[in-house]
Regions:
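Residue-level recognition of alpha-helix termini/interfacial anchor residues
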Residues: 56-59, 174, 256, 304, ...
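General helical secondary-structure elements
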Residues: 71, 77, 160, 232, ...
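Membrane-interface aromatic/basic loop that binds lipid-linked glycans or pyrophosphate carriers
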Residues: 274-328
Length: 328
């Protein structure tokens, strides 16, 4: 009997002490045997790594296939994922966040589907997990690249890496990296670019991954500081820019992809808006081509459309007047 292909599982670790034991146990207890685990500790300042090492000790049959990469300083989730990819040796690559967990048949089911269908990318449904239970999130957006790209740009398809499996040979051929230093929406941008590189996409109508939504210490949940939040918004703009340029270079920035991309760009630059005029001027010069989506984007209110229209025409005074009159 031929040996099953090796799967590399990449798990960035950052301040996940209350959750990481459950994550690690769910990965170690997979029904699939041939797994290489790469944990990338991005300089956590809690005891995540200690808990990780203690938990791994409970699985001696897996321990030889575990590698822990420790950053001497925080480098961000994008670089952590790139470091994991650089160290990967498996035929397939999967990802998990250290505060989430998976069902025991996840790897086996995804790899079997990829092998049978000769897929470069396989994605599946997932659970949003709350303290009072799970919510099933369906992800059936087909297996055609254009449809998948548009669904991801519109944020209908989740842009995460963790509900997807990738053939590593394809990743090497595609040559796409996470954008170092741009740690917001880095997974969405990466997945959009990869979907543009292959027609061999598979989908499984079943959920295995539990996306934990009650970790108040996660990076997304803790974006409260204004300066930090603005920096993250600029990182999002950078990821959107890299991905849209790539789609344009591939000749895909037309028709429904172009329309979806412009809405994606508009939503990214809208996050730059703050109370100061500098942020408004930054909005004006960021993705000006996306302004045509102002009156086609169903995700913004009529009042906000009018405000954006004033900015499009460089009428900051009228923007402030409307804000004053409407109180918002």
């Amino acid at each position: 009997m031929m040996a099953k292909p090796v799967v590399t599982y990449i798990i960035p670790v950052y301040n996940a002490e209350p959750f990481i034991e459950r994550c690690v146990r769910s990965l170690m207890e997979q029904s699939y045997a041939n797994i290489e685990y790469i944990f990338v500790d991005d300089c956590s300042f809690d005891c995540s790594t200690d808990v990780l090492r203690r938990t791994i000790d409970d699985y001696p049959e897996r321990k030889a296939n575990v590698r822990i990469i420790a950053h001497s300083a925080g480098r961000g989730s994008a670089t952590s994922r790139n470091d994991g990819l650089d160290a990967a040796k498996g035929e397939y690559v999967m990802f998990a966040d250290s505060d989430d967990y998976v069902d025991s048949d996840y790897v086996e089911t995804m790899v079997n589907h990829a092998e049978i269908g000769q897929c470069d990318i396989v994605y599946c449904d997932f659970y949003e997990t709350y303290q009072d239970g799970d919510r099933l999130i369906r992800q059936d957006y087909g297996t055609q690249p254009i449809g998948c790209i548009c669904s991801m740009l519109s944020r209908a398809m989740h842009g995460s890496t963790w509900n997807k499996t990738f053939r590593r040979k394809f990743l090497l051929h595609a040559g796409q990296r996470f954008v170092d230093g741009a740690d917001l929406f880095e997974d969405v941008g990466w997945n959009v670019r990869l979907m543009a590189c292959t027609p061999r996409i598979g989908y499984i109508s079943k959920a295995f991954y539990h996306y934990v939504k009650y970790n108040s210490g996660s990076i997304i949940a803790s974006m409260t500081d204004k300066a930090y939040s603005r920096m993250r918004c600029l990182q999002r703009v950078r990821n959107v820019d890299v991905s849209c340029r790539f789609l344009d270079e591939r000749g895909l920035m037309r028709g429904e992809v172009r329309r979806a991309a412009h809405i994606w760009m508009l939503m990214a630059k809208n996050d730059l808006i703050a109370a100061d005029d500098y942020s408004l001027k930054r909005w004006m010069v960021t993705f000006p081509e996306a302004d045509e989506a102002i009156w086609h984007c169903g995700q913004i209110t009529l009042n906000f459309r009018l405000l954006l229209t004033w900015l499009h025409y460089r009428c900051i005074g009228l923007y402030h007047l409307q804000k004053l009159l409407t109180g918002r």
